[in-house]
A protein has these predicted regions:
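A C-terminal functional module that forms or caps the active site or interfaces directly
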Residues: 148-195, 200
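His/Asp/Glu-rich mid-to-C-terminal helical/loop segments that flank catalytic regions of hydrolases
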Residues: 195-225
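N-terminal short beta-loop-beta anion/metal-coordinating cradle
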Residues: 1-67
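Generic non-transmembrane alpha-helical segments
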Residues: 20, 121-134, 161, 177, ...
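Mid-sequence, gly/pro-rich, charge-dense loop/helix-turn segments that line enzyme active sites
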Residues: 80-162
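Proline-aspartate-enriched helix->loop->beta-strand connector
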Residues: 68-73
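Alpha-helix C-terminal capping segments
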Residues: 62-66, 80, 84-85, 176-184
Length: 225
């Protein structure tokens, strides 16, 4: 049976997924709760990793070691970093990387890779589902760091250096982990704010709306994969 893993950082990012999946088995391993459901002949596992890269990497590796998924989807909300991307649009990662670490340390030392590519089939599936739902979507780079970006000045610096479509706090870590484990991966994020001076206010207003939208997209992806 095919196994699909879904990882989100916050309970709000997984609440709708869990409600739509219904009651299933829950296993607690290494401090993480893994929700396990059978859906359309596939095993779908979801976990709330907690915020930031260390939590995301730990949860991803524990999930891989214990459940051996065929692919990993990182879901949730993110800040928009490209002027074309609006609140409630979807960004599908083409690649992920940290914005708060000199990539020299990743490229010139293990794992000898600083930019982690997303899987083509997963990207295509996410884009197809967005089209089915009539949701505006973009493929592009997602960057991650250890802070919620809500400053015009910080946003501009990240834009100039990395030219990303979205910023979050976990995608790069999940992608890094999947790269090391040779697993197909994609991050599918719904924009909750523009990562600017108004970011915190926008996040509070659109968090639940954005989380529900991306949850519906990710669950539809599991049906097509």
């Amino acid at each position: 049976m095919k196994c699909i893993a879904i990882i989100g950082a916050m309970p709000s990012e997984l609440a709708d997924i869990r409600e739509m999946l219904g009651k299933g088995e829950i296993r607690r391993i290494s401090g993480f709760d893994f929700y396990i459901n059978d859906r359309n002949g596939k095993t779908v596992i979801n976990a709330c990793c907690g915020i930031a890269k260390v939590n995301a990497a730990l949860c991803t590796q524990v999930m891989i070691d214990n459940f051996h998924p065929d692919c990993v989807i990182n879901t949730g909300i993110a800040g928009g970093m490209n002027s074309a991307v609006k609140v409630c649009d979807i960004v599908i990662s083409t690649e992920v990387l940290p914005h708060d670490l000199d990539l020299h340390f990743l490229k010139d030392y293990p794992p000898y890779c600083g930019i982690f590519k997303a899987d083509g089939v997963l990207m295509d599936t996410a884009e197809k589902v967005c089209g089915e739902f009539g949701v505006s979507s973009f493929r592009g780079r997602i960057v991650s760091g250890e802070a919620f970006i809500s400053s015009n000045e910080v946003k501009k610096a990240i834009q100039e250096k990395f030219d990303p479509y979205a910023v979050d706090m976990e995608s790069a870590a999940v992608g890094h982990c999947c790269y090391l484990n040779e697993l197909p991966y994609v991050s599918v994020r719904c924009i909750s704010d523009n990562a600017d001076d108004e970011g915190a206010m926008s996040f509070d207003e659109f968090e639940k709306i954005a989380a529900k939208r991306v949850a519906e997209i990710v669950l539809r992806m599991t049906e097509l994969l």
